[in-house]
């Protein structure tokens, strides 16, 4: 089997409750080149820069810098819920695949519009909704 280069993924936002955990997972995955983070809020960015979840992370100066990098193929959107759809829209408009945490945002129609744009551009949008720690799923895993 031929080896492939790691997938270059960036993170947009740090305000979601799971943001630093996802940054840690992306950084540790050998199949991912976690290439940086952009956070529009100076206060949130400075706080995140002091946390262990972002240790060693590159920080972009603007969304345009991150989204304009053609080597970045996907972006994990990790802002506040009310910000996520606008962030995701910027990402798909820039031709990036998107990973969104739950909930995707506040307005279903906006989410559906993003999905339509992504589909038209041949992009993937993945909504994270994991049950791996749910007791019922743990029992299923134990039986498998």
Protein language model regions, located:
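Beta-loop-alpha module in the N-terminal Rossmann-like domain of NAD(P)-dependent dehydrogenases
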Residues: 57-117
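Alpha-helical structural signal in soluble globular domains
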Residues: 25-29, 48-52, 90-94, 110-117, ...
């Amino acid at each position: 089997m031929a080896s492939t280069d790691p997938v270059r993924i960036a993170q947009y936002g740090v305000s979601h409750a799971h943001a630093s955990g996802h940054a840690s997972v992306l950084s540790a995955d050998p199949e991912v080149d976690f290439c940086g983070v952009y956070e529009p809020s100076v206060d949130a960015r400075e706080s995140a820069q002091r946390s262990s979840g972002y240790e060693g992370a590159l920080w972009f100066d603007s969304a345009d810098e991150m989204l304009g990098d053609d080597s970045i193929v996907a972006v994990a959107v990790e802002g506040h819920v009310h910000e996520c759809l606008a962030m995701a829209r910027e990402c798909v408009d820039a031709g990036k695949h998107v990973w969104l945490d739950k909930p995707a945002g506040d307005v279903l129609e906006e989410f559906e519009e993003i999905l339509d744009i992504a589909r038209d551009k041949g992009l993937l949008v993945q909504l994270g909704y994991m049950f791996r720690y749910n007791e019922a799923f743990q029992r299923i895993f134990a039986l498998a």
